[in-house]
Structure formats: C-alpha cells, structure tokens
Regions:
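Short, well-ordered beta-strand segments in beta-rich or mixed alpha/beta enzyme
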Residues: 2-8, 39-70
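An amphipathic, aromatic/His-enriched active-site/gating alpha helix that lines ligand/cofactor pockets
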Residues: 28-36, 57-94
Length: 119
C-alpha cells in the first residue's frame, strides 16, 4: 500500500475558501485503478497559516504514478492555480510506502432512546 500526501500552508483567514474549493471539486478518483481512499485533513494553526494535507491511499506506488499521468489527474487539477492568493507557498508532496498495517475494529453498542410497544 502507498500513501500520497500534499501538504498545504493556507494563509490565516482563508481556511473556509480552501475547504470550499475541496468540497466542490470532483477528484475523478472513484474509477482509478488502485485507488482506495481519500481524506483532506486539517492540522494545527501556526502564526500566519493553517496546515492541511490531502491524504490518498493506493494499492501500489505505481498505481499512484499512473494516475498522475492520466486524463483523470489533469481533470482533477484543472484550474488549481486560480486561488494562489490563499496559499503560503507551493504544496509539498510526500509519498510513503506502508510497511506496517493495523486495523482496529470499532464495535458500536447502543440502546434505544425510547421503546415502542411497552418494552
């Protein structure tokens, strides 16, 4: 498995604009071979920016590389430079091969707030 991350430094006060851009964009990832999962994560606030990262999970690094050469990638990044006023510098890419993988099982237990039928 492979994790691809882009780290973004978003100028303080521009966070809502950045999040709106991501919420409204089509990533074109749903049918890409090897794609598993995507998250946009928000980090800590610094003196003049907030850190964000796009975090995508891939079956292999090669699947990710193939996506970066695809039409789907070009479509997903179309117009990416239009909002340069919200960024403090260029995004920083980081790629990671997963060497240990652990899945934690979450068990939900609940009881009804009310019962029907006198129970």
């Amino acid at each position: 498995m492979y994790i691809a991350m882009n780290r973004f430094k978003i100028i303080s006060g521009k966070e809502e604009t950045f999040e709106k851009i991501w919420r409204s964009r089509d990533t074109h990832l749903e049918n890409v071979p090897g794609f598993k999962k995507f998250n946009l994560i928000k980090g800590s606030e610094k003196e003049n920016y907030r850190l964000y990262a796009s975090h995508s999970l891939w079956e292999t690094e090669n699947d990710f590389i193939n996506w970066t050469k695809s039409e789907a990638f070009r479509e997903a990044h179309k117009g990416a430079g239009q909002h340069s006023d919200i960024y403090l510098g260029h995004p920083e890419f980081e790629g990671f091969e997963i060497i240990l993988w652990s899945i934690f099982k979450i068990i939900w237990s609940f009881r009804p707030l009310y019962s029907v039928g006198g129970m």
